[in-house]
Every structure is written in C-alpha cells, then in structure tokens.
Swiss-Prot record:
Gene3D superfamilies xrefs: YVTN repeat-like/Quinoprotein amine dehydrogenase (2.130.10.10)
Designated name of the protein: Protein hir1
Source taxonomy: Eukaryota, Fungi, Dikarya, Ascomycota, Pezizomycotina
Stretches with biased composition (Basic and acidic residues): 503-526
Biased composition (Polar residues): 471-502
GO BP field: chromatin remodeling; DNA-templated transcription; regulation of DNA-templated transcription
Gene name linked to the record: hir1
Pfam families linked to this entry: Beta-prop_CAF1B_HIR1, Hira, HIRA_B
Originating organism: Emericella nidulans (strain FGSC A4 / ATCC 38163 / CBS 112.46 / NRRL 194 / M139)
Length: 1031
C-alpha cells in the first residue's frame, strides 16, 4: 500500500486590525492505493509534547506522524510516518492522546476502544507485507481492549489529569473508564440518540457530551483514585445540566458533533447549532449554561470545533507590562477553529466579531476533525476525502501566546487547577476555610494549654469569627447547645463556682458523676482519710472503651411523649389508629381447600332443624356459644341514646383475593376533625372540655344516618351530612350518598373517605376540588399535612395527592414490603403481620410508617422503594442509641434562635428519625425483646472475631442516620449526625471513609462542604458577612 505525500503551499491573506495576516497551509494528500480508492480520515490529535500527530482512517489503521517532518516538509530525509497500528476490525472514528502523554486511545465501529503505549524498545517487525511503507520508527503496542459499547464508538475524551477516559457512541451510551486500570467505572444512559462528541473542562470538574437528541449534557465528576472501582464511583459522574435551546432544529445529518472547551474554562463551543434558519456554533457560558453568542458564517452544519490550548494577548507581552500581582495587564483572548460539511475552515478570536481566517474548498469532502499543537502555532485538520491539512500561523497572526501559567491562573477561580490544588471557588467556600482555620487554631491552643497544665483551656468552637464555647462532648456524642440563662451562673455539681461569663459550658452529668466517684473518700480504722481507687476501664479485649448502649429496662416516667421538644414535621393523627396499632393480616399463596361441610356447620344445621320442627322459619342470632334461635325481647321505651358505632363497614370484594388485609374502621355516627387558629389539628370541644373551646377555630363534622330508612328500603336511607363550623356558626354544608368512614383537613382543604372506597376533597370555602377519587378498597387511614393527603386502603395501597397541583409524587405503593409479606407468602394459613402503630405524612409528601415490631420506614419517591430508618438492631448494638437524653432522643431545634423566615426551611422533616427511634425503643421494651437482644450482643462480644462488632455496628448506625436525614432533607438531624459521624471515623482512624466523606461525588473539599454547609444553615447567602458562618 503506497502513500503519496505531495505538499502544496497555499497562502491566504485576510485583513485584520489594519494589517495583513499570512497563514501558510500545507496540504498533504494521503491516498491509499491498495484498492484504488482513498480512505476517509476521521480523526486526528497532537501529542502533549507536540512532536507527534496521530490520525485514524477508514482503512482500520492508526497512523502516527512526525510533526517536525510535516512542518519541515522541504526536508525529504526526515521520516514522516513513525508507526501504524491495525488492531480494529473496522473503520476507526476517533483517536486521542492522554494529556500525560503516556497512552493513546482509539475507537472504531467494531465497538472496541484500544489503548496503546509507547514501548522504549525498537520495533521488532518491518513494514506490512506487500506494502511500500517505510519500516516503523517507533514501537507502539496495544495494552488493553475496552469492551463496553453496543454500537460504533464515535468520540473519545481524556480528563485533564488523565484519571478517566470517556467514550461515546451510536448506542447512546457514555462510558467512563479508569485512566489508570482501564476498568469500566460507570455507564451513563441519559441520551436518547447517538452521542457524537465529548469535551472536558480544563478545570477538571465537568465534561460535556453532544448527541443527536439535540442536547448537550454537562456532567460533574470527581477524579477517581487510581484504585477506584465501579462500586466506589456509584455517586460520581452526575448530570449537572441539559442544554437544548441552541439545537432545537439542528440537522441530524452531521457525522460528528465535536464540541470544545475554552482553555480558560469559561465557554463551550458546541457544533451543529442553529440560529434561526442558518447553521452556527453556539458559545455556552460556564455556570449558567446559557449563551447568546453564535458564530455564523458556515453554509453547512459545523461538525467540529477546536479551541486553541493557549491564551493570547493582542499585543506583545513584556515584563514591564505586568502589574504587582503578576497578572497581565491586557485581557487575554481565546482562539477557536471551526469546520464542517461546507469544506471550509474558519478561525475566530474573542476580541473580533468576525473570523480572522476563512479558507474554503480545502478538501473535496467534509472536514472531520481539528487538532491544535500545544503551542497554538499550528492547526491540523482531516477530511473525508483522505486529506490531512497542516495550517501554520506566524507570530502575531492570532495574537501573542501567553505563558501556560496564565492558563492556570485563569482556572483558579473555579477552585482548582490541573495539578488538583484546591482553593475556594466561591465566597461560601472561603468563609468555610476561614472558619476551619480559626477552629484548628483554637483547638491547637486548647491542646497546648492542656499539655502545659492550663486548666482554663477549652475546646471552644468559633462561630462568626468569634470564639463561642460549646458544651462538652462525651464519647463522640454532641449535646444540644444550651440556651443562655441564669442557670449558667449557679454553682456546678461539684461545688465549685461557675465562671461569670455570659456563656459558659454546661457540664456533662456523666463526667461529673465519674469525678465524684473518683474523689470518694474512705476512712481507715485509725481515722486516716484515703481516696478509694475506682476502676474506670477493664482489660477485657471484648469490651469497648467507648460508651455502652444505654437501653432502659422498663418504661419509666422519664420517657416523654411521642412529640419531641422540637417541631416534628409529621401529620397529627387525631382521627387516630386503635390502641396497639392497625391490625394487619397476610395470606400466603398456599391455601387449603375449603370444606363444604365441617363439624361446626353440622351443629348449626342440627340446631336449625330442631328449631324448625314446628314449621316456622327460625331466626338465628350470634352468641358466644354459636348460632342460637333468637329470643323475643321487650320493646325499648323512652329516648334511646345514639350509638357510637352503627355497624361494621361492608368489606370490599377485592379483599378476598388480596394477600394483605388491613382492619377497616367501623361506621360511626359522628366523625369530627377540629383545627385551631394556627391551622393545627386539636381535640374537638365535645371531648376536650370547655377549656379547649377557645383554642378550636374550625370544626369539620360528618354525621352518618343512624335511623331506619324512611321508605323501608336500604337504598333510600338518608344522605350523610357534612358541615364546617366556626364556633357555633356553620360556614358551609354538603351531602354525600355514601357512608363516611374517615375525615381530615386543615387550612388548605377538607377531605372525607367513604365506605365504597371513594375520597372527596373540598376547598376551604366548600367547593369540590376534584371529582370523587375511587380506590380499590375502603380507606383505613386518612391523613393530611399542608397540601398533601395520605390515604391507605384496606389492601395496603398508599396514595399521596397534592391538592395544590392536583398531582401525585409517585404511583400508589403497597405496604407489603414493609409488613414482611415475602416471609408469609408461602404460608398455608393466614398469619398476623406487625401492626401499623403510626402512619403519617410530612410537609414534603413523604410517607412515614411505624410498626409494632419497632421498625420505622419512609418511602423514597426518587428511588420508588421503602427505606428502613429505624429497627431494634440499632437499639441494642449501637453505642449511639439513646432514647431519652438529648441530643438524640429529644433533638432541640435551633431554629427558635434564628430568624422567622428560616423556620419553614428548618422544619422540613424535622424530628422524624428521633420519632421513629423512640417508637423502636418503646415497642422493643413493651414486647420484651430488649433482654434477649442484649444477651445475644453480649454473647457475640465474647467470641473470637467479633472484637470490632460494637464499633462497626455503631458506625453503621450513624451512617444509616446520616443517609436517612439527607434523604429526608432534615437539616437539624443532619447537622448532628454529620458531626457525630465525622468525629467517630476520625477517632477510629478510618482513612478511607474520611476521604469519601470529604471527596464523595465532588471535585475537592469545597464541593462537599459548601452544599452541606448550605443545607445545615452554616452559610446563609441572605445574611451579612459577619453572620454568614453562624452555627
């Protein structure tokens, strides 16, 4: 196979800034004459040192050329082609050097990505048999073949630190590979059509992909460690933004959509965009991911864009033009080259609204790829007619290239540079760094004071730039901050006077008790005073020096009510569940055949036959002894009281085939829901006495008819009357033809659930908001919170509706997974499942379920599954389980000392996890499981191999709390649990977990601390700078 290399010199004169620009274009035609046809050249790239040009073509070869020989084409003795590799079985569409220069990657239509590396040994083989090519000069060998695509690989991209390689293809997949081990880290299937381009952020925080679904998608990522696996990167590579506006009517005929990121990290040049009816290149701004700049001029779709890797200055750079801060006085500009289906090349600079170079008809077919040399002086292009072009610019044609340090300086504002040195990207990150440094300095002073014997050294934290004493910590558990009061000036338990400062430390009662025990005096026979020794730690290897699990042996008066001292973001069940919870019954698939006649039926038939011997039709009544003939009774006299319950509800036929059945409430004559002036549910006046009437604002009442039908037919019974009262004055009234079982409501709406499974919703003014919502069975639980309504049917289906948007956050979800239906599915008989002791909904529409076995669940609308937030295992195995003491059991809300406009944000999901854990403690103690579980834990601790059992379970418990609080958006709980978890893993020396906590799915420390700080309220954009770091 012969290669014909014929250089041809072209000169293009373009006027820019009142002077002439001369661009020398060397055109080299690569004709592959093996089959008397020229193969398309699809891709090219330049090595980081600028010495090699690599090309990929339709002949299945990856060819490496010497850039020195190309630019110095007048010297025919220099070898132009250094090596050629043929490891693909089809057309090669893309080829890219890694930024560290160590690897070369290629992708082809055989769905394979090949990785090459340069071997220092000379090549051991000559040119291919039957070819006229010169023997190879360099030895490039294939080290890996990456299999992960289902169709052609269209483009490749390396991160700036070479830590990852990303491949895109016609299978709509974006596959991320490790740049160290070349293992597949993640597959992103977010595009709906062919993906034809990828580019990386020079700040190493994002990468962008372009697809035929007419979108450019931005992904945020953190550079993985060299030993990272796919499991480690599950939360990495997150979709940040989807850009659609510039591509809404873009043509789908383009072979590539190769975009490029500017070297200063500010812009993305997206190919194949449109501006009205004409093709253009869209310039997308970083951060906002929008832009109103379009490069217009090409007559056909632009398929490839390439920013020059250097920043340029319009004027020559001199040392005396730099200011004292070592920044160039003149604003730098960037240069971008564009090409596509019109076979023309345009070069633009940011300081000029028009292109400075336009070269037309450079090839017979479309230009497929562009690549700049590292110094920005030469531009290479490939075309589908087999052409490889080299465009060389003289000094000053594009401007004057700045030093690479200017690139690094321009990237520091994004929080990092290519070397990964993280700095604060935003003012929030800077404030956190200052706070962290002040805290570290205070901690060092405290430790030095302790070493030097200074008893006044304390571990104060710094808030708002001022030292603020925090309460002492015990065993990694951070107590709630005490409110300043006069109690702080009273004497301490050991008799010493407290400091006179306005804010003092609240002593730990356990530490004070331990000090008193240590100082307990004893007297010998001769009257001498001695201090009795106290064993504060044992030598047993199975015992932990950390706090033991404190689980109460019995429920005492210290156990508080279900409502903690802080606001619990849950609905209040006043039309509540029965004592002991709502009974549930699970049916297995294996049912015994129903007998036509059993022994009991026989006895009944005998009694019926005996009663009908005289020819009368017997009337039977149900008695404890069974079915007995009815006995006449005296007629009632006087006024009869209205019964509380009229009858049991009629069971829906669908329950006969359901494997889950919940107890259906009885039909009551009078159902009431009352709220106070603040819109919170309260007890109605009839049951709470006169003292509560002043607090009741509105009462919603449903009255079911208790008397007989006026016509004698059951179908003609009286309708149900629903009335809304304010005081004694009715506001509105409505009637329903169906018996009402449950009612609920608040200031946003009122709702009633009927016996036939229908749910009605009214506005506060009495207007029916929607038509009747028909469920598959009777509702057994009906709750509301804000605009949300929760309805649970008798077959265990949970429905959540938003009355403001008339929508549901997720499809109906079954309670079977929560009630361990899988355990009982194969049972031959019905079995009792755990009872539902609490079913609530929070202000975000999340379902919260508490069971009689102590487990607590929340439904995740994003994962479409139940999440177990609390269980008895943590109560006896975790060292951080504490049911009655702050800060875990009775979490104090910090929002009462903050501004009122923060209350709503702070109350989201507040107190849910402590509420579920208190339920776990109570149910565990009531059912006597605590004693047996504690014995099991003690037995495990004494066995070999379980030395770290208690520590592992405690850390897992904190991780479960942390994940639950983050999922629920509970700010106060997340603040506490994150502090406890960070202290514990730091004390245990778990370096891997510490690194994951700090790096996680973000690029550096600021990317994980700033979102957490905003969630916790540490950083508040609305407050002043002095108050921005308030804890």
């Amino acid at each position: 196979m012969d290669i014909l290399y014929r250089p041809m010199l072209l000169s293009i004169y373009v006027c820019r800034a009142s002077r002439t620009v001369l661009a020398n274009i060397f055109v080299s035609f690569s004709g592959f004459l093996g089959e008397r046809k020229a193969f398309e050249v699809y891709s090219c790239d330049v090595s980081p040192d600028g010495s090699r040009l690599v090309t990929a073509a339709g002949d299945g070869y990856v060819r490496i050329w010497s850039t020195e020989a190309i630019c110095g084409a007048e010297d025919a003795n220099k070898p132009k082609q250094l090596a050629s590799m043929s490891n693909h079985s089809g057309t090669i569409h893309t080829v890219r050097f890694s930024p560290n220069g160590k690897y070369l990657a290629s992708g082809a239509d055989d769905k394979i990505v090949c990785i090459y590396t340069l071997d220092a040994n000379p090549p051991s083989h000559a040119a291919s048999f039957g070819s006229n090519e010169a023997p190879p000069v360099e030895n490039w060998r294939t080290i890996r073949r990456l299999i992960g695509h289902d169709n052609d690989v269209q483009d490749l991209g390396w991160s700036c630190d070479s830590s990852i390689l990303v491949s895109v293809g016609l299978d709509s997949k974006v596959v991320v590979w490790s740049g160290h081990t070349f293992e597949k880290l993640k597959t992103l299937s977010v595009h709906q059509s062919h993906v034809k381009g990828i580019t990386f952020d020079p700040a190493n925080k994002y990468f962008a992909t372009a697809s035929d679904d007419r979108t450019v998608r931005i992904f945020r990522f953190t550079s993985p460690a060299p030993n990272s696996t796919a499991h480690d990167q599950m939360n990495n590579f997150v979709l940040e933004q989807t850009i659609t506006a510039p591509f809404q009517n873009s043509p789908l005929t383009a072979y590539f959509r190769r975009c490029s990121w500017s070297p200063d990290g500010l812009h993305i040049a997206a190919a194949n965009a449109v501006n009205g009816p004409v093709s253009s290149v869209a310039i997308i701004n970083r951060g906002g991911w929008d832009g109103d700049i379009n490069l217009i001029g090409h007559e056909a779709p632009v398929e490839v864009c390439a920013f020059s890797p250097r920043l340029y200055s319009p004027q020559p750079i001199k040392k005396n033009q730099q200011d004292s801060h070592d920044h160039v006085a003149q604003a730098p500009v960037t240069v971008i080259a564009c090409a596509g289906g019109d076979k023309s090349l345009s070069v633009w600079i940011t300081s000029n609204p028009r292109p400075i170079v336009v070269a037309q008809e450079l090839a017979a077919k479309s230009i497929s790829d562009l690549a700049w040399s590292p110094d920005g002086s030469c531009l290479y292009a490939t075309a589908l007619d087999g052409t490889i072009l080299a465009v060389r610019f003289e000094d000053g044609d594009l401007g004057y290239a700045m030093e690479l340090e200017e690139n690094e300086k321009s990237l520091t504002k994004f929080g990092t540079n290519r070397k990964g040195a993280g700095i604060a990207e935003t003012t929030d990150g800077l404030l956190l760094e200052e706070k962290s440094k002040a805290g570290e300095l205070k901690g060092v002073e405290g430790r030095m004071g302790a070493l030097m014997g200074d008893g006044h050294a304390t571990g104060d934290a710094v808030a708002n730039g001022k030292p603020t004493p925090l309460p002492s910590t015990s065993n990694g558990v951070t107590p709630a901050a005490p409110s300043p009061s006069t109690d702080a000036q009273k004497s301490q338990p050991n008799g010493t006077a407290a400091p006179s400062a306005s804010e003092t430390e609240k002593p730990d009662p356990y530490q004070a008790k331990l000090e008193r025990l240590k100082q307990r005096p004893t007297y010998t026979k001769d009257g001498k005073k001695r201090i009795a020794p106290l064993l504060v730690s044992g030598a047993g290897g199975a015992e932990s020096s950390l706090p033991q699990a404190r689980l109460m042996a019995s429920v005492s008066s210290q156990v508080k009510a279900d409502t903690p001292q802080s606001i619990v973001d849950l609905s209040k069940p006043f039309d509540g569940l029965p004592k002991g919870g709502l009974a549930t019954l699970l049916f297995g698939n294996k049912r015994k055949l129903a007998q036509l006649e059993d022994e009991e039926d026989g006895h009944t038939e005998k009694r019926v036959a005996l009663a009908s011997q005289n020819g009368a039709t017997p009337i039977l009544t149900s008695a404890p002894e069974g079915l007995l003939p009815a006995q006449p009774q005296d007629p009632p006299t006087g006024q009869q009281p209205t019964p509380e319950f009229i009858r049991p509800a009629v069971v829906n036929p669908c329950m006969s085939v359901s494997q889950l059945r919940l107890a259906v409430p009885k039909v009551r004559t009078h159902i009431v829901r009352a709220i106070d002036s603040a819109g919170k549910p309260t007890e109605p006046p009839s049951t709470s006495g006169e003292s509560n009437k002043s607090r009741v604002d509105v009462v919603f009442e449903a009255r079911n008819p208790s008397g007989a039908s006026l016509t004698g037919r059951a179908a003609d019974r009286e309708p149900v009357r629903l009335t809304l009262f304010r005081g004694e004055q009715p506001l509105w009234q409505d009637f329903l033809p169906r018996t009402v079982l449950l009612v609920t409501g608040n200031q946003n709406m009122w709702s009633a659930a009927c016996e036939d499974g229908s749910v009605y919703i009214w506005t506060p003014a009495g207007r029916r908001l929607v038509s009747a919502l028909v469920l598959e069975a009777q509702p057994v639980i009906l709750e509301c919170n804000g605009p949300w309504i929760l309805s649970i049917s008798a077959v265990g289906m949970c429905y959540v509706w938003n009355v403001e948007h008339l929508s549901s956050p997720h499809p109906p979800v079954s309670l079977q997974p929560v009630l361990d239906a899988a355990i009982h599915t194969l049972g031959a008989h019905p079995s009792a499942a755990p009872s539902i002791t609490n079913a609530r909904i929070n202000s975000e529409g999340r379902i919260i379920i508490a069971l009689s076995n102590g487990e607590g669940y929340a439904y995740s609308p994003s994962l479409y599954t139940w999440q177990r937030l609390s269980e008895a295992w943590w109560a006896v195995g975790s060292q951080y389980w504490n049911s009655t003491e702050a800060p875990v059991g009775n979490l104090q809300s910090a929002s009462n000392t903050q501004q009122k406009d923060k209350d709503a944000r702070a109350a989201v999901s507040a107190g849910i996890i402590p509420f579920l854990e208190r339920n776990t403690t109570n149910e565990t103690l009531l059912r006597g499981r605590a004693y047996f579980l504690q014995r099991l834990i003690k037995t495990l601790l004494s066995r070999e191999g379980y030395e770290s059992f208690e520590s592992s379970v405690s850390i897992a418990h904190l991780e479960n709390r942390l994940a639950g609080a983050l999922s629920l958006g509970a700010k106060e709980e997340f603040r506490l649990y994150l502090s406890m978890y960070a202290k514990r893993i730091g004390a245990e020396g778990l370096r891997g977990k510490v690194e994951e906590l700090l790096k996680g799915k973000h690029r550096d420390l600021q990317r994980v601390t700033v979102p957490y700080a905003k969630l916790l309220g540490v950083v508040d954009n609305e407050s002043d700078a002095n108050d921005a770091m308030e804890l």
